[in-house]
């Protein structure tokens, strides 16, 4: 068996309109992040072409919007200790009711985002633009 070494990773933080994205792992295969969202902020309504992600709420309360399969948005309350898997193609948005802290694990498709506000007749909430 080949002898492999572990490597230290230096986390880095990106400031977003909604809070902070702290990268704690970044490899060609996966990303690990801590997301800190400010109360009253939301990410964009979006889906990913290739990115497969799971997020876990450590603290705070959030609303998760998702397409219910009929073209309508469903809103679900997310509480600490709950986790959601977002497969590629699933329309979703997270809105922080309180200050929230999430753990996110995903594939390494960082710039993979298609914004969907217009498709659902909603105003653009700002945030990151479509990359695909």
Predicted regions and their residues:
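A short glycine-rich, His/Asp/Glu-containing loop-to-beta-strand
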Residues: 10-46, 51
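Glycine- and acidic-residue-biased ligand/ion/polar-headgroup-sensing regions
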Residues: 50-67
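Well-ordered beta-strand positions in beta-sheet-rich domains
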Residues: 34, 75-77, 91, 99
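Short acidic-glycine-tyrosine-enriched beta hairpin
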Residues: 68-89
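Double-stranded beta-helix
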Residues: 5-10, 14-15, 72, 95-132
């Amino acid at each position: 068996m080949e002898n492999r070494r572990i490597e230290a990773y230096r986390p880095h933080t990106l400031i977003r309109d909604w809070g902070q994205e702290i990268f704690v792992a970044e490899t060609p295969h996966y990303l690990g992040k801590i997301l800190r969202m400010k109360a009253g902020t939301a990410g964009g309504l979006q889906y990913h072409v290739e990115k497969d992600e799971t997020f876990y709420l450590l603290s705070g309360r959030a609303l998760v919007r998702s397409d219910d399969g009929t073209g309508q948005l469903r809103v679900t309350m997310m509480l600490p200790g709950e986790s959601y898997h977002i497969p590629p193609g699933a329309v979703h948005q997270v809105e922080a009711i309180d200050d929230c802290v999430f753990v996110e694990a995903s594939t390494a498709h960082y710039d993979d985002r298609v914004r969907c506000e217009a498709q659902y007749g909603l105003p653009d909430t700002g945030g990151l633009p479509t990359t695909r």
